[in-house]
Amino acid sequence: FLDESGGACYCGKAGCVETVISGPALEKYYHKISGQPLNLKEITERYRDGNDKYAQQTMERLFAYFGKAISVVINIIDPDAIVIGGGVGNIAEIYTKGVEEVKKHVFNHRLDTQFFKPDLGDSAGVFGAAFL
């Protein structure tokens, strides 16, 4: 588990990826530290502007925990590719800064796993379920 301060997950546990680095979790974290509710797109824009310390803190937290979470997957199953879905997959920096954080935690000194945005955007899971 990543960080139990994210609160209870819908699965009944705490510290799950969903409660720490999903879009809603990032929005909740930003609101908690800043007192201001913003959506993920607004947080990302403020991060890029560089003038909002809470957006900076929120995004740096995302990259750090993303690196830890994804490195566990890579260290265990060594996938050729990972598709980053959901709102977080729309953040361009996840494919640069986030991947740099992954590199810090993988067993191998080089990272061969490729990272992709889903071709179907945020609806990839819905389309996949429909095909079942």
Q: Where in the sequence are the language-model features?
A:
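Short glycine-rich, Thr/Ser-proximal phosphate-binding strand/loop in the N-terminal lobe
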Residues: 1
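ATP-binding/phosphotransfer module of carbohydrate and carboxylate kinases, centering on a glycine-rich
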Residues: 4-132
